[in-house]
């Protein structure tokens, strides 16, 4: 039980760090992180489309992030390694954040979703799925799913081959959840796939969206 509590605590901590970095590094094209324990402390790999923004002038921002990770989140001797995302259009986290930013700028949710989906597919993705959940058009909350191409949906392939990302858009009507899943060009297609040759859209129930 103690081991289970430890892993739960570490998972929650990583989630909180991810949320913090998403807010702090939106302009950097933040694409997620990986935390690894080492004999010397904690290695934190930050993936970003613009590593220079994460590092900051003279390394100022990365030093500040290091202090926050140590003092606020309790990481032992954190060592930050910033890795560049070669193609942000194939990183689901980056795309989820960009869609959220578009919604916050007042762009209609369908336009934001289809624009992102088109750009993702044009960059070679085998498939993409975008889910927007919340008060999209009025007082009633709903979830709309946009999808195209080939996407592993279940089992190990869905966990290992598909890039997944989540972000939130803060609007006057409330919070809009943005989920993005992308199957990259080099993914080997499993048996369990969904094939949609043309862009499609459907409204799904709130329960299903969860």
Curated annotation (Swiss-Prot):
PROSITE patterns associated with the record: KH_TYPE_2 (PS50823)
Query: Where does it sit, as one GO cellular component term?
Result: cytosolic small ribosomal subunit
Keywords per UniProt: Ribonucleoprotein, Ribosomal protein, RNA-binding, rRNA-binding
Q: Which Pfam families match?
A: KH_2, Ribosomal_S3_C
> InterPro entries, alphabetically?
KH_dom, KH_dom-like_a/b, KH_dom_type_2, KH_sf_prok-type, Ribosomal_S3_C_sf, Ribosomal_uS3_arc, Ribosomal_uS3_C, Ribosomal_uS3_euk/arc
What is the purpose of this protein? Binds the lower part of the 30S subunit head.
Which PANTHER family has this protein been placed in?
Answer: 30S/40S RIBOSOMAL PROTEIN S3, SMALL RIBOSOMAL SUBUNIT PROTEIN US3
Q: How does it assemble?
A: Part of the 30S ribosomal subunit.
The name under which this protein is listed is Small ribosomal subunit protein uS3
UniProt organism field: Pyrococcus horikoshii (strain ATCC 700860 / DSM 12428 / JCM 9974 / NBRC 100139 / OT-3)
Q: Taxonomically, what lineage is the organism?
A: Archaea, Methanobacteriati, Methanobacteriota, Thermococci, Thermococcales
